[in-house]
A protein has these predicted regions:
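A contiguous, basic/glycine-rich beta-loop/short-helix subdomain that forms a polymer-engagement track
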Residues: 324-349, 360-367, 461-576, 584-585, ...
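A substrate-engagement module of RecA-like helicase motors
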Residues: 181, 187, 241-349, 357, ...
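Conserved RecA-like P-loop NTPase helicase motor core
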Residues: 573-584, 632-745
Length: 779
């Protein structure tokens, strides 16, 4: 096997030279963002003989390994005597001398790598290195150190780094060799392909090999997890730099991907895979700040991590939550940082959307570097539209401000008091003379920018130097403000900034109307992406809103692999569940439900348009000899799992689950066989008319697209299709669905019906429902 390795300077020196503790008082998202800004400011102040963000790359052969080392130097200065100097800029909230002394080997190592690359490019015998330190919040405070090296000194230094890195990386080379051998021998893990499965697999293989974006509607039963992962893995053979990101919004999606890989491993595949778990779920020290004074797992993290990675990769290939926490606990290291570092040496990374698409929490280690080898599988892609909008939107709450101010009312910190006073004045100025309601701001106010910036700088200083002043309420508010401030950089024609004025409060809301261009930008960074779901109709709408190109990106809509007659769709158009009519429908809908469940003992879901409607329905429905379980607001994951345990196979009594359409039980639920035999869907799933959706509709209207469809109709019908999809989960399942609303007979809604719904039957009374289903279940 030819051994090749592409490394960024950051990857090399961070792995080998970083030491000490995790400390979010010094290294955090806010300080990184401010650091980027100060980098740009400082670079712009230099003269014409200063080159900023200079790209460097060189190929080396070390111990039989072909290594490409690359990166961007912060600056290159040509001095008057013709000599060159590499400028490495570091900014920090910490005192400069302490920061420099704690991190010198790491910083000078990075600069020396850039210096060597530039010396090779320009054929220089010697070169200078400058370390420029700038204090955040006190930009005039700088520390500049100059060093000079011969090319031979730099060569010895960099080659020594290579040798140290390869001593560790030989584990990975051995793994890659085994992985490639087993991928070559790997065959599809099932005896035969299901209907549509081979077609989906071929498309995915082509995307993984050739690049591009692909959109696929793959209904339940096709086996879309295996049909996407298997060809991606097959296509990645002999490309040691490819990482496959399996992105999903739900725990069930992670479990499906994990189980698919385990099945392939059982057939001989050797592959490193990891499931990334959210920080709040994996943390050992909940409530602690991420610094060595509060969390023992932060202390000495960077001194330990090389050894822990070496042990982990020698002994494991599957890294799930249990394995990660076990290793981290044993070695007393932070499990969250550990799983992120470990992912660098894994082939498949199973994680939430935000690790790729969120502008604040995306994995910079992958997407701030060259990502052109990587592949993405976006599961349940219909969810990414709203999720991405949320990622690029933010809110500052006046109530959160009041809570923060109250929590530090006894503080004597002068600058904090001043920052809070400025915020109070800002809220007063913005809302002066405004009635309750939503008020759009035409421009982003200068005062808003300056006051938020002052507050952030103040909190950064407190967080580092007077941490005892940072109450939970102040920290929570600071994080909200910091997120809002960062996202303000995106403010433009795809945004509105508005005030939501309430009777006793106000929210400042930065709303992203359309995040498709941001999704597209991320997808352009990587080699290939497949975005798939059981519900991607109308397909043009999803390609539009998920950053695709309707004219050029391939798409496919696969038919259901299940017998069409196994699902009975009934439409009850005599009932109007529109907002103005709802109060008159509870008893009538209750009668439809009673007759729907009358013929067959079993498990049924009843989907209501809202919690309020569900409560009134339960008050008005008269049910006997049935067990009833009701979804509650804000159910935790373990509560949802317990809820579903009430719907077991071979029930002796009828069990009803009352829930809200579009909620946790509308998708990602897999109740096979007779664990679920029917669903009643009340209404069309459309969100209630609201200010933000109206603005989204207006945005698309202004671009000559059907705004109401984009903001209301399509998302609503998607929730309905997802809910219907809970009923038939295998080839042997039989079940029925009752759609209650007059609008289901309207053409604009019927145009969105799936192909297997086209044989739906209209029922004009509860008795007709009972009669129809008696024949269906009898047959």
């Amino acid at each position: 096997m030819e051994k090749t390795l592409t490394l960024s300077v950051h990857q090399l020196v961070d792995f080998l030279l970083r030491s000490g503790d995790i400390d979010n008082r010094v290294f955090n998202r806010s300080s990184m963002t401010e650091g980027s800004r100060l980098h740009t400011v400082y670079q712009s102040q230099q003269g014409s003989d200063y080159l900023s963000e200079y790209p460097l790359q060189h190929r080396f052969v070390v111990g039989g390994v072909d290594i490409t080392l690359q990166g961007r130097a912060d600056g290159i200065l040509k001095r008057k005597n013709g000599e060159y100097m590499i400028d490495e800029i570091k900014t920090t909230v910490e005192e400069l001398e302490i920061f420099r002394n704690d991190n010198f080997e790491w910083h000078i190592g990075q600069a020396k790598c850039y210096a060597y690359l530039f010396a090779l490019e320009q054929n220089l015998d010697s070169i200078g290195v400058r370390l420029t330190y700038i204090r955040q919040g006190k930009e005039k405070e700088k520390r500049i150190e100059d060093y000079f090296f011969s090319r031979s000194e730099l060569e010895s230094y960099v080659y020594a780094l290579f040798e140290d890195y390869l001593a560790f990386y030989n584990i990975i080379f051995k793994h890659i060799e085994k992985k490639n051998e087993t991928i070559e021998d790997l065959t599809f893990p099932f005896e035969k392909y299901r209907r549509g499965q081979r077609e989906l697999t071929k498309y995915c293989y082509a995307i993984a090999k050739n690049g591009g974006r692909f959109f696929a509607e793959a209904p339940t039963g096709i086996g879309k997890t295996m049909s996407t992962l298997f060809p991606y893995i097959k296509a990645s053979v002999d490309d040691s730099e490819t990482k496959i990101f399996y992105l999903t919004a739900k725990t069930s999606g992670k479990e499906a991907a994990y189980n698919a890989i385990e099945l392939l491993k059982a057939q001989g595949l050797e592959l490193n895979d990891i499931v990334i778990t959210a920080k709040d779920k994996v943390c050992f020290c909940k409530g602690c700040a991420c610094n060595p004074d509060e969390c023992p797992y932060a202390k000495g993290y960077y001194n330990k991590i090389q050894g822990v990675l070496n042990y982990s990769l020698m002994n494991y290939t599957t890294f799930d939550l249990e394995t990660i926490t076990e290793i981290a606990k044993e070695n007393e290291i932070c499990p969250f940082e550990f799983e992120l570092d470990l992912s660098l040496f894994c082939d498949v990374i199973i994680c939430d959307y935000n690790y790729m698409f969120d502008p604040i929490s995306y994995m910079k280690r992958y997407f701030d570097e060259d990502a052109s080898h990587h592949l993405a599988l976006v599961d349940e892609a219909h969810n990414l539209i709203d999720r991405s909008r949320d990622m690029y939107s933010s809110t500052i709450s006046y109530q959160s401000f009041l809570d923060a101010r109250k929590s530090v009312r006894h503080s004597k910190h002068v600058r904090l008091k001043r920052a809070l006073a400025k915020l109070k004045k800002l809220f007063d100025n913005l809302t002066e003379g405004l009635e309750p309601g939503q008020h759009i701001l035409d421009d982003y106010p200068d005062e808003l920018y300056s006051v938020l910036n002052y507050f952030i700088e103040t909190c950064q200083d407190i967080n580092k130097n007077e941490h005892q002043e940072m109450t939970k309420e102040l920290l929570d508010f600071y994080l909200d403000v910091n997120e809002f401030f960062k996202l303000s950089d995106f403010y433009g024609d795809k945004y509105i900034l508005y005030l939501d004025v309430l009777a006793e409060s106000v929210n400042i809301r930065l709303l992203c109307l359309d995040a498709s261009s941001y999704i597209a930008r991320t997808l352009r960074q990587i080699k290939g992406a497949t975005l798939f779901s059981a519900t991607l109709q109308p397909i043009d709408y999803y390609i539009d809103t998920l950053g695709g190109d309707k004219a050029n990106d391939p798409r496919i809509i696969l038919p259901s692999p299940f017998p069409i007659n196994n699902l009975r769709i009934l439409v009850a158009p005599k009932v109007s569940v529109r907002w103005k009519d709802r109060d008159k429908t509870y008893k009538e809908v209750g009668e439809y439900i009673k007759h729907f469940i009358k013929n067959k003992v079993g498990n049924y879901f009843i989907y209501s348009p809202s919690y309020e409607y569900m409560d009134h329905l339960l008050e008005n429905i008269d049910l006997e000899d049935v067990d009833i379980y009701v979804q509650t607001k804000d159910m935790r994951e373990e509560e949802r799992e317990t809820f579903l345990l009430n719907f077991m196979p071979n029930p002796e009594r009828t069990t009803l689950g009352f829930m809200v359409i579009g909620g946790a039980f509308s998708e990602g639920i897999d109740l096979v066989s007779d664990r679920l035999i029917g669903a009643v869907i009340i209404g069309i799933g459309m969100p209630r008319i609201n200010f933000e959706s109206d603005k989204i509709a207006e945005f698309y209207d202004s671009r000559e697209l059907p705004g109401r469809d984009y903001a209301y109709l399509n998302p609503g019908m998607n929730t309905v299709m997802q809910a219907v999809g809970r009923v038939i989960r295998s080839e042997k399942d039989r079940g029925a669905v009752l759609l209650i609303d007059e609008r289901y007979t309207w053409r604009q809604y019927q145009d969105l019906f799936r192909a297997e719904w086209k044989n739906y039957q209209v029922v004009l009374s509860p008795e007709e429902v009972e009669e129809n289903l008696a024949k269906f279940f009898k047959n």
